[in-house]
From Swiss-Prot:
Involved in microtubule formation, polymerization and assembly, regulating microtubule nucleation and length. Plays a role in pronuclear migration and mitotic and meiotic spindle elongation during early embryogenesis. In complex with zyg-9, functions during the early stages of embryonic development to regulate microtubule assembly throughout the cell cycle. Specifically, the complex is required for the formation and growth of astral microtubules and spindle microtubules during mitotic spindle assembly. Its main location: cytoplasm. This is Transforming acid coiled-coil-containing protein 1. It is found in: Cytoplasm, Cytoskeleton, Spindle pole; Cytoplasm, Cytoskeleton, Microtubule organizing center, Centrosome; Cytoplasm; Chromosome, Centromere, Kinetochore. InterPro entries: TACC_C. Expressed in touch neurons. It comes from the Eukaryota. It comes from Caenorhabditis elegans. GO terms for biological process: astral microtubule organization; cell division; embryo development ending in birth or egg hatching; meiotic cell cycle; microtubule-based process; mitotic spindle elongation; mitotic spindle organization; negative regulation of microtubule depolymerization. One of its GO terms (cellular component) is mitotic spindle microtubule.
Length: 260
């Protein structure tokens, strides 16, 4: 879209005034405010239905219309073009107003001047509307940018907390692994001790069983000896009784023989 302004002189020649972004105190190398403000929150693609490109175009369009209105106010020559397609709406030349004479002749007619003034007022109203829309969009953009900064701060806090939680989890995991290794070593040691005790118990049990068996055998042999000795005592007792009876009989016979 061309924003250059063309004026027609009295001799019929056309003078084209190129659009310069450094007019009205704006340096050429100055970047649009919207672009600078959009850098902290590049993730916001649309704002109130308008993209960043729409906002930038609206800003430059507003600036161009403002400059055009200023040139119309301070120039006798005028030309009104549409910003959308560059179509010439009206052009001509008007005389300056001096005290006492009003609008002089020679140049554009009153109808053309009135039409140009109406077009100027319409362009000014459109520029004011665009400027108001731009201000509203810029305020909304600042609100969104502040919200994005708040979200970014919350994200940073959450990330720091997540790092602390991850470090704490790693610490607890290291402690758990240490306790697990200690428990495994203690379990292995207890298992070895249990196996040793079980083997010792089996050996002791076998030894005790052998001793019991040997004692049982010895007891059985002792019982057999006791039985044999008991039988011998019984036999000796019978023999003693028989001998005593025989002694008594022989004593009785001796007494009888003596009496005779």
């Amino acid at each position: 879209m061309s924003l250059n302004t063309t004026f027609t002189k009295e001799d019929g020649t056309e003078v084209v005034i190129p659009f310069n972004g450094s007019q009205n105190g704006h340096p050429e190398n100055e970047e649009p405010e919207v672009e600078e403000a959009a850098e902290p929150s590049s993730s916001v693609e649309t704002l109130c239905g308008a993209t960043r490109g729409d906002i930038i175009v609206m800003k430059h369009t507003t600036k161009a219309l403002t400059e055009l209105i200023e040139r119309l106010l301070h120039s006798d020559e005028f030309e009104v073009r549409r910003c959308s397609n560059g179509q010439i709406i009206s052009q001509g030349r008007c005389n300056g107003t001096t005290p006492g004479n009003g609008i002089g002749g020679g140049g554009a007619s009153s109808e053309e001047l009135e039409k140009a003034l109406k077009d100027r007022d319409a362009a000014r109203a459109e520029a004011d509307k665009l400027h108001a829309n731009y201000a509203t969009l810029f305020a909304s953009f600042n609100t969104v940018r502040e919200a994005a900064n708040d979200i970014r701060g919350e994200y940073e806090d959450a990330r720091d907390k997540l790092k602390l939680a991850a470090a704490e989890v790693d610490e607890w995991q290291a402690k758990f692994l240490a306790v697990k290794d200690n428990a495994n070593s203690e379990l292995e040691r207890a298992s070895v001790e249990y196996d040793d005790l079980l083997r010792s118990h089996d050996e002791n049990t076998k030894g005790l069983r052998l001793r019991v068996k040997r004692q049982e055998i010895e007891l059985s042999s002792k019982n057999d000896e006791i039985k044999v000795l008991t039988n011998r005592v019984s036999e000796l007792s019978q023999i003693c009784d028989q001998l005593l009876n025989d002694v008594d009989v022989s004593d009785g016979m001796s007494v009888i023989s003596t009496d005779a």
